[in-house]
Amino acid sequence: MSQRRRRSLARPAALLLAVAASMALPALAADTAPVTLKDAYAESFLLGTAVNDDIVAGRDTRAQALVPRHFNALTAENVMKVEELHPTPDSWNFGPADAFVAFGQKHDMFLIGHTLVWHNQTPAWFFQDAAGNALAKDALAERLRAYIEVVAGRYAGKVQAWDVVNEQIGEDGTYRDTTWVRGIGDGDELMRLAFTYASRYAPDTELYYNDFNTWRPEKRDGIVRMVKQLQAAGVRIDGIGMQGHWGLDYPAIADIEAAIDAYAALGVKVMITELDVDVLPLTKEGQIIGQGMTHPQFQLPEFKRFLDPYRDGLPAEVQQRLADRYAELFALFHRKRDVISRVSVWGVHDTMSWKNGYPIPDRTNYPLLFDRQYQPKPALDTVLQVPRKR
C-alpha cells in the first residue's frame, strides 16, 4: 500500500478519534465535577442555610453565588423577626423580608420564616399599652393574633414553613420566664394560641417549634410534653427544629440521637437547624457565660488571649477536629434520614457567623463550612464524603 493511501486512510480514522474524544470530555468533566451539598444529600434531606440582607441584596456577592449552588432551603436570619418587620406600633417594614422571599423563589428554594413568637428581638412596646404598662393577657393575645394575621397571611403560599415559636422551654423542661410566658400567664396556652393563629392564617404552611439544647433529656422531655398537649387539643404542629449550636466535643452523639428519636416518635418532622460548630473556649452555656464575661477581670489582656486564641488563624489540628466533628454529625443525620427532613447551617461563611460575637464579643470564630475567603474548608469535604461511604 502506498504512503499516500495510508495517509488518506489515517485522516478519517484520526478524525473519528478526535470526535469520540470530544464527545467523551463532557462526560469526564461531569464525573469529576465537585459535588455540592444539596446534590450530595439529594436523596436524604433538604440542605439549608441562613442568609442575611447583605447576601439577598447582593452586597455580599460571593456568598450570594454560593447559596444557590450548595443549598435548596433558606431561613431568614433576622429580617422576619418582629423588631425588623414591626419596629414601632405605627410602622411596618416588609422590604427586606419581601426581598428574601423573592430571592428564594428565584432559585426555587424551600423557605422558612423565622420567627413569629420570640422574646428576643421583639420590641418592648409589643408587650405594653399606650401608657407603657404591661398589656393584660387578653390584649396581648389579640396583639399576637393580629400580628400573625398580617405576617403569616402576607407570606402564605410564599414561604413553605414558619418557626412559629422560638426558645420558650427551659433546661429543666418547664417554660422559661419570658415576656411572652409572663404576658399570657401560661406557657401551654401561649403555644396553643400561637400555633392556632399560625394555622389559621397560613393553612398550607408547615409549622415548627424551634429551640436550642433540645438534646438535653429534661428539656427534650418538656418539648415532647408540649407537643403532646398541642396534639391532644387538636392544634397543628408539624415539626421540631433542633438548633445545632454545638462544639467540638459536645453534645454527645448518643444524646442527639436519643432526642431525634423522641421527637420522631411524636409523628412530626425533625430538623437540624442553626448548625454551627464552635471552636473557641468557653462557649457552652453561652447565656450564662455572656453575663459573667462583663466582669472587669475578664477584660485583662491575658484573658483576652485565652478567650480568643485563633485571631491569626485556625491551627491545622483544630481544623482537623472541626472536620471530624462535622463528619460525625452528618454521619448521624444521614443515618437518621428517614426522620430528618432538613439540615440547615447557620450562615454561609465564617465572617458572617453570629458566633464571632457570642457569647463573648469580638472574637474570631470558625464555625461554618466556608472560610473568610469563601473557600471550602476541610469540614466541607468530610460532609460531602458521608453519603458516598454509606
Regions inferred by a protein language model and the residue ranges of each:
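Bacterial N-terminal signal peptides
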Residues: A13-A24
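Boundary/entry segment of secreted carbohydrate-active catalytic domains
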Residues: D31-A73, E77
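Aromatic-rich peripheral "rim/lid" segments of glycoside hydrolase catalytic domains that contact
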Residues: A33-L37, W125, R154, D163-D188, ...
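Substrate-binding cleft and catalytic face of glycoside hydrolase catalytic domains
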Residues: V35, A73-P87, P96-W215, P281
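Acidic (Asp/Glu)-rich catalytic clusters
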Residues: K38-A42, T61-N72, D98-F110, A152-A156, ...
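Hydrophobic faces of well-ordered beta-strands that scaffold small-molecule active sites
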Residues: L47-V51, N72-A76, L111-T115, Q160, ...
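Acidic-and-aromatic substrate-binding clefts and catalytic sites of carbohydrate-active enzymes
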Residues: A50-T61, V82-G95, I169-T174, N213-G222, ...
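Short, acidic/polar
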Residues: D54-R69, R143-V151, E218-L230, Y326-L332
